[in-house]
Amino acid sequence: MVRFTSPPNSQVFNTRVWEIVRQIPSGQVTSYGQIAAMIPPPQGMDPKSYDAFAARWVGGAMAVCPEGVPWQRVINAQGKPSLRVGAQEQRKLLEEEGVNFNEKGRVDPKICGWSGPSPEWLSQHGLFPPPGFGH
C-alpha cells in the first residue's frame, strides 16, 4: 500500500470537505469517516488506499477550515469530540445546539447523527451517499 500523508490535491479535497460540513444542520453530527466516504478517491488512487487515509485527510481539512464552517459538528467514530485543543469548546458548542452527551462523553448517533445531504445535492456535487451513521 502506498503511503499518502495528504491528499494529492489538498485544496480540492479540503474544499469538498468544507462544502459537505456546511450542509450539517445545527443539532446534528457526523464523523470524519462518514464525510470521507462521500468523497470519491482522487484520480489514480485505488479505493483501498483511499479508505486507509481519507478520514485522516478530513481531519486535516477540519484543522484548517475557514470561518463559517461548523467544525464542531464533526466528531470521531467513537461519538466524541476529537482529542485536540478545542475539544471542550466543541462540546460546549454542540450542547448549545441541543446535542446531548452521555456519561462517557459520547454522542448517540441514533439521536443526533446526520444522515447526509439530499441525493440531489450529492449528485450535483459528484459525491456518494454516506453509509448509515446511526440510522
Where are each of the predicted segments found?
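Nucleic acid-binding interface residues in structured DNA/RNA-binding domains
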Residues: V2-H135
